Amino acid sequence: MGQKINPHGFRLGITTDWKSRWYADKQYKDYVKEDVAIRRLLATGLERAGIADVEIERTRDRVRVDIHTARPGIVIGRRGTEADRIRADLEKLTKKQVQLNILEVKNPESVAQLVAQGVAEQLSNRVAFRRAMRKAIQSAMRQPNVKGIRVQCSGRLGGAEMSRSEFYREGRVPLHTLRADIDYGLYEAKTTFGRIGVKVWIYKGDIVGGKRELTAAAPAGADRPRRERPSGSRPRRSGASGTTATSTDAGRAASGTQEAPAAAEAAAGTEAAAGAAAETTTQNPGS
């Protein structure tokens, strides 16, 4: 189900791409172990750097590592000392030449991994979990490319004895739609009561034919034309609404205009009948 599976793996090869790009035959398991070790090394050594993603690409005698970070200054260090140290550690681990590329993330509020890390840091600093979740949602929804977000926290929330899960959602987050561009992030907050897992899903529109649809930015029903009432005045309909033909000034005026000729005709008919009766009495006085 789309609600249970990792969104990246669910859409792999459809709307998302592989984060490790290389080919191996007999060394496949060794390369997989190396990739896990590289990501673990960067995650533990650069916790405050705000790393959003790590991409690994291998050639015959070289390993290229792309680090997407919101704080490139921490990764580079003063005069590049930190970057040199990271490169040396990676070369020692892989025993190959390492090309290290540090890329800056322009909008960290719209990256799920960075949003989850921000919420986890607030939870570690004893901020109320509901306040941290709502603040993250408000910051993400201000971005023009974000159409919906869901944030979930699981663990001993608020120091409760029994663990539980709570989530907040705003906008659309279609987890089971394969063409939907869903960004997913997971981070664990270390608190005095134990670990609290933070998961974030961010919906950024649909991808059709390799291009993101711009129609997802418009709210539902925005293209539907509005029906306007004609400019001319029209009498209100009577019936279930409780409005009768004479309950308004316009209705009373219309009713009075229609009743005046009818009353005049009735009066003329009465006078004619009275005149005919008087003539009959004059012609037959004895009767």
UniProtKB/Swiss-Prot annotation:
InterPro entries: KH_dom, KH_dom-like_a/b, KH_dom_type_2, KH_sf_prok-type, Ribosomal_S3_C_sf, Ribosomal_uS3_bac-typ, Ribosomal_uS3_C, Ribosomal_uS3_CS. Residues 216-287 are annotated as: Disordered. It comes from Mycobacterium sp. (strain KMS). This is Small ribosomal subunit protein uS3. One of its GO terms (cellular component) is cytosolic small ribosomal subunit. Binds the lower part of the 30S subunit head. Binds mRNA in the 70S ribosome, positioning it for translation. PANTHER family: 30S/40S RIBOSOMAL PROTEIN S3, SMALL RIBOSOMAL SUBUNIT PROTEIN US3C. Pfam families: KH_2 (PF07650), Ribosomal_S3_C (PF00189). The lineage of its organism: Bacteria, Bacillati, Actinomycetota, Actinomycetes, Mycobacteriales. SMART domains: KH (SM00322). The keyword RNA-binding applies. Belongs to the universal ribosomal protein uS3 family. Residues 238-287 have a biased composition (Low complexity). GO terms for biological process: translation. Part of the 30S ribosomal subunit. Forms a tight complex with proteins S10 and S14. Keywords: Ribonucleoprotein, Ribosomal protein, RNA-binding, rRNA-binding. Coiled coil: none annotated.
